[in-house]
């Protein structure tokens, strides 16, 4: 394994520089488009994507590339290591000038994240990890919570998602909040600020790869909603679903989500 500390330093610096560029693009005035699925994309997304691709691939020309704003290429599958990038995660928050947007970057090796950063510039928070060394926020070690009862849990999810006839066992009352950026939601679980985040629909690798490593290194458990492990840099760059939670809560959540069939 090559120098992960060097890779981490590279992606942390690049994420910070990308955030400065995003802010400059906002000052110039954002051009906003709609993707085929209806989600927004801005001139800042494209500018940060181009900057990060040049910055990172110039430094590591033998690494592959996967980004939300770059057309995918099967050539990445030939690389043992790739960068997985979301130039701006939480574009809706970015447009609305809410502080939860972030820049997540992961280095994937042999299908698993080995270095990751989630930079949240508006809140001056930088989450980072390399495999086997723990997770940190602004240089301080972070740990997932020790909450062990759903009744005591705080979730980053929609309360409506956990209602309806699909649930064989009803969910107890819990505290719910929302954040637009999925990577930041995972970082908050890693830091113990929330106990879990749940998503029952497929999620793109660029939304969850960095958060997966940071959360796991902080002691959280990250799987799909059936308890299956994730693998990255596959032909279809999506994960079926997401359970990212404090370790004691994970089996309690799976008791309920295990009855829901896979979406794909």
Model-derived regions: residue spans:
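An extended, acidic
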Residues: 144-264
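Residue-level signal for inorganic ion chemistry
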Residues: 22, 45, 56, 91, ...
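Short coil/turn connectors at secondary-structure junctions
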Residues: 61, 79-80, 111-114, 150-152, ...
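N-terminal subdomain of lithium-sensitive/metallo-dependent phosphomonoesterases centered on the IMPase/IPPase/PAP
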Residues: 1-88, 249, 262-264
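DPxDG-like acidic metal-binding loop motif
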Residues: 76-136
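A structural micro-motif at secondary-structure boundaries
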Residues: 137-144
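Short loop/edge segments at beta-strand edges and connector loops
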Residues: 67-69, 139, 226
